[in-house]
């Protein structure tokens, strides 16, 4: 891998700085499709609410993320950034941001060793300073500091890695501790809080909080309505099929497509495949989600039933081994298998290691079973929309990243209002604010309640309009 790193110019590791001009041109286009972030820049640029914030960012290094980074910087923050997935970086985006002087450590197709090296680097600030905020996607940056600090006290927590990724992570922590036995606890103590982007990372935060292990306050950005009901649903509805088609050129119409999981992500995936006239089958563990799928006209089955019949498989559960080797052995020749959940273990990719692998092109592999049958595995089981395409469109990411920016401001400027070890969601009025910022771009006009109407339903004229338990 021909990474570019030039300490004399800037602190970065990217694939090719010659791509910076291309990245800058795409950033300019993305800004026109990200009204929420641009409005927040305008609102807060003068007051600089993030002045003094040193943000360690671990989130897909895409063009849209570049607009987020430059928004954080415009509001006064200093930022160091790595991608949260080995395949999701857009190299021209990384180069464009590095060219501005913001440290970026991200290359599309980086190794696991490089991934954890780069995640360490977002916590290695110059002049003896340290990060005081984390912006996370999937929880790896948060995990790294907590696990490393535990290992300082008890190295046996690194004794039994459960996967190849854990083996690499544990080795990286041991190597770091050999250089500096207090590396992790020193940095952990400086963190005011984390804002977490995605479902998987949020699950980790709640688990840590319940166990009393979370060392700072957290804001769950994922469960803002203007994130989960937009990014997860409408974003996946457009980016899933983009990834599958770029990877395989498959005709979706008429095929049987299985979507594992019918949460917000699964709903978007099922809608996209159905819109292209696939026969969509859904697997679910939750009777409520299963009933929703059935009443949308989708066939609800088990993976054991579906494996031998379907042409396309998509995992969207956030769970573990949803598709096993046994399932894949039962599949048709040339079945397409992919994942749109955060981690690569929804599909038992490790269980395929002793099969023959044949790369068709980057992030597209034939996995050949002993009987000669082949399946097409996309992005090695990692996020198909980012591994095989460019992820969600800019507009929907503006909504997600507006939430991230507001959450960073909230947690940094009002840190005393948030209890260490607890996980919070943004209040409803901020959720509604994010939605308002995006209406004009779509030509949408809000109606306004009269005082009498507001009194009749018991809400303020200016909102919030729904109680916290409302599900949208």
Swiss-Prot record:
UniProt GO cellular component terms: cytosol
Binding site for NAD(+): 198-200, 232, 261-266, 284, 319, 340-342, 385
Chain sites annotated for binding substrate: 62, 137, 197, 227, 231
Note describing how the cofactor binds: Binds 1 NAD(+) per subunit.
Transmembrane segments: none
PROSITE patterns according to UniProt: ADOHCYASE_1, ADOHCYASE_2
Reaction it catalyzes: S-adenosyl-L-homocysteine + H2O = L-homocysteine + adenosine
GO BP annotation list: L-homocysteine biosynthetic process; one-carbon metabolic process; S-adenosylmethionine cycle
Subcellular location: Cytoplasm
Co-factor requirement: NAD(+)
A single MF term (Gene Ontology): adenosylhomocysteinase activity
EC number: 3.13.2.1
Enzyme kind, highest EC tier: hydrolase
Function field: May play a key role in the regulation of the intracellular concentration of adenosylhomocysteine.
Protein name listed in UniProt: Adenosylhomocysteinase
Species: Bordetella parapertussis (strain 12822 / ATCC BAA-587 / NCTC 13253)
This protein's encoding gene: ahcY
């Amino acid at each position: 891998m021909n990474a570019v790193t030039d300490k004399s110019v800037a602190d970065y590791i990217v694939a090719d700085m010659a791509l910076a001009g291309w990245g800058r041109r795409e950033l300019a286009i993305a800004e026109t499709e990200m009204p929420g972030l641009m409005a927040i820049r305008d609102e807060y640029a003068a007051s600089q609410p993030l002045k003094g914030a040193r943000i360690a960012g671990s989130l897909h290094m895409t063009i849209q993320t570049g607009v987020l980074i430059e928004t954080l910087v415009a509001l006064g923050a200093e930022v160091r950034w790595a991608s949260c997935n080995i395949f999701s970086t857009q190299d021209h985006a990384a180069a464009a941001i590095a060219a501005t002087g913001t440290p970026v450590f991200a290359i599309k197709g980086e190794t696991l060793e490089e991934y954890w090296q780069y995640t360490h680097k977002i916590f290695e600030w110059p002049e003896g300073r340290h990060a005081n905020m984390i912006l996370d996607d999937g929880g790896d940056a948060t995990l790294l500091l907590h696990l490393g600090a535990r290992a300082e006290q008890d190295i046996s927590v690194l004794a039994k890695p459960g996967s190849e990724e854990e083996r690499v992570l544990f080795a990286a922590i041991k190597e770091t501790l050999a250089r500096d036995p207090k590396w992790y606890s020193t940095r952990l103590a400086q963190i005011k809080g984390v804002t977490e982007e995605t479902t998987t990372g949020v699950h980790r935060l709640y688990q840590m909080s319940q166990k009393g292990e979370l060392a700072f306050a957290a804001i769950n950005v994922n469960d803002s309505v203007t994130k989960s009901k937009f990014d997860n649903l409408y974003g996946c509805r457009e980016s899933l099929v983009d990834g599958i088609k770029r990877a395989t050129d498959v005709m979706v119409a008429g095929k049987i497509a299985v979507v594992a999981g019918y949460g917000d992500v699964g709903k978007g995936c099922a809608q996209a495949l159905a819109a292209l006239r696939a026969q969509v089958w859904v697997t679910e563990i939750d009777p409520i989600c299963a009933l929703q799928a059935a009443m949308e006209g989708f066939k609800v089955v088990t993976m054991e039933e579906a494996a031998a019949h379907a042409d396309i498989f998509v995992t969207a559960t956030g769970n573990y081994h949803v598709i096993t080797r046994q399932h894949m052995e039962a599949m048709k020749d040339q079945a397409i298998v992919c994942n749109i959940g955060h981690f690569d273990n929804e599909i038992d990719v490790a269980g395929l290691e002793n099969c023959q692998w044949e790369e068709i092109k980057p992030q597209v592999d034939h996995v050949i079973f002993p009987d000669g049958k082949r399946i097409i595995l996309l992005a090695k089981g990692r996020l198909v929309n980012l591994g095989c395409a460019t992820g969600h469109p800019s507009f929907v990411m503006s909504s997600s990243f507006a939430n991230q920016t507001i959450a960073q401001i909230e947690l940094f400027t009002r840190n005393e209002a948030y209890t260490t070890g607890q996980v919070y969601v943004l209040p409803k009025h901020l959720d509604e604010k994010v939605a308002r910022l995006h209406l004009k771009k779509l030509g949408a006009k809000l109606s306004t309640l009269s005082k009498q109407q507001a009194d009749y339903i018991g809400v303020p004229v200016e909102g919030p309009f729904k109680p916290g338990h409302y599900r949208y």
